């Protein structure tokens, strides 16, 4: 399986992963040969590239659960993009709590391991995909840690919103997680604080979300101002955020393995 940028796709290449639209409808299945129309669709969807099979490569097995996970990710990234963009325009995120409830139904009550799929990110879509994955991981952690339903809801909403105003940063800084200069770290910290300020108290969100986000910001970027006692919700967010950042797949960067992330 190799990754091919959208501009380098060729008619007849076989897809290694399925492609869904924003409503979760399967457009192209695994092992389908991509057509000229399909290549145009990829570009219109804003996809930066696809995983394809090499000419003689057999199709690797993929469970129904894994395919459902990819479908869920695709739909929720589109929905989360709309909700975060609404807040950036000073509008109510009308469907954010429904997205929270849907995610908790899917991942907030599991008793078995899942194959956590990392989706490839561009600088333009990094914030949305990162926020969704942190929310999924936070839901999994919160269940195993015995959080109440209210706490689970708070941690998922906070995960959705924790990088909100990074959308205003230059694209190359949005997904940069290693080797930040002091100036870049300051830019990111200011963006995160501005994001908290953009979350209106009038929004229909869990009451503790803004406090949780400020606490998380202090732990991540302003440790000298962080309280000594870190809440369990913030601890879950720190772990989920670090795991996703460490294992994320970005163009031009080699991801770390899950084993590396656990040892981190």
Enumerate the language-model features and the residues they cover.
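Terminal helices and disordered tails flanking the catalytic cores of nucleotide-processing hydrolases
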Residues: 1-100, 110, 247, 251-264
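Alpha-helical scaffolding flanking metal-ion-dependent phosphate/phosphodiester catalytic sites
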Residues: 157-168, 180, 184-264
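A broad detector of the eukaryotic-type serine/threonine protein kinase catalytic domain
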Residues: 24, 85, 139-143, 222, ...
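Short hydrophobic/aromatic segments of transmembrane alpha-helices and their interfaces
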Residues: 22, 149, 227-228
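Residue-level preference for alpha-helix termini and adjacent loops
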Residues: 8, 14, 18-19, 26-27, ...
